[in-house]
Amino acid sequence: MKTVTVKDLVIGAGAPKIIVSLMAKDIARVKSEALAYRETDFDILEWRVDHFADLSNVESVMAAAKILRETMPEKPLLFTFRSAKEGGEQAISTEAYIALNRAAIDSGLVDMIDLELFTGDDQVKETVAYAHAHDVKVVMSNHDFHKTPEAEEIIARLRKMQSFDADIPKIALMPQSTSDVLTLLAATLEMQEQYADRPIITMSMAKTGVISRLAGEVFGSAATFGAVKKASAPGQISVNDLRILLTILHQA
């Protein structure tokens, strides 16, 4: 399986990489939180742009991105607008969503974008090609905050992301039972062993799914999300505890 290298970070080799999400509402908070995050041990900074209030002002959005880039120049920056239908803070049109991601790509400030699988096949394919033409990697994602589908459906979604040339397919699902967590882990393992030719990220959410956030190296998930202050999804562990646990599992 090929790895994905962003800056000096090799995703898909060694222990799972730690992603933290910054969810500031304005430029002042972006700056203050970025300074606080700089003192934290993580691998990838995700900027959750759906939390940013001045979203209609592209210049303001890119000014905030510039602050993040200048504050943590060595960290890969993942630009993410999480749609309301997949658990995000704001609802915008598909056209606005694509335009926002294209603006981020054009800015030269971001290393990766998050692109939701169910945005629309044509729009997804075109945006992936556009990102790659500008040397920006694509994390293609799907989130279900209500349920966990069967393993076959999980694998089908991950394979579809791969067929759309995502650099890193990602899926996050809500378990209704412990069996759902096992379904997610089994699907991850099958995808990793039989179909994946690139790193994937999977997780089962909430307290029930915490084990999935730690066991990526065993089952085949290349990264996991940790909380610096407020968790961006249910079940996230503090970033400091997460690094300790991942290191223990990696060295065992």
Swiss-Prot record:
Listed SUPFAM superfamilies: Aldolase (SSF51569)
BP terms from Gene Ontology: 3,4-dihydroxybenzoate biosynthetic process; amino acid biosynthetic process; aromatic amino acid family biosynthetic process; chorismate biosynthetic process
EC number: 4.2.1.10
CDD domains named in the record: DHQase_I
Keyword Secreted: no
UniProt entry keywords in alphabetical sequence: Amino-acid biosynthesis, Aromatic amino acid biosynthesis, Lyase, Schiff base
Family matches, as InterPro entries: 3-dehydroquinate_DH_AS, Aldolase_TIM, DHquinase_I, Type-I_3-dehydroquinase
Enzyme class: lyase
Location of the active site: 143, 170
Catalytic activity: 3-dehydroquinate = 3-dehydroshikimate + H2O
Listed GO MF terms: 3-dehydroquinate dehydratase activity
Known role: Involved in the third step of the chorismate pathway, which leads to the biosynthesis of aromatic amino acids. Catalyzes the cis-dehydration of 3-dehydroquinate (DHQ) and introduces the first double bond of the aromatic ring to yield 3-dehydroshikimate.
Record-linked HAMAP family: AroD
Protein name per UniProt: 3-dehydroquinate dehydratase
Source species: Shigella dysenteriae
Lineage per the UniProt record: Bacteria, Pseudomonadati, Pseudomonadota, Gammaproteobacteria, Enterobacterales
Gene coding for it: aroD
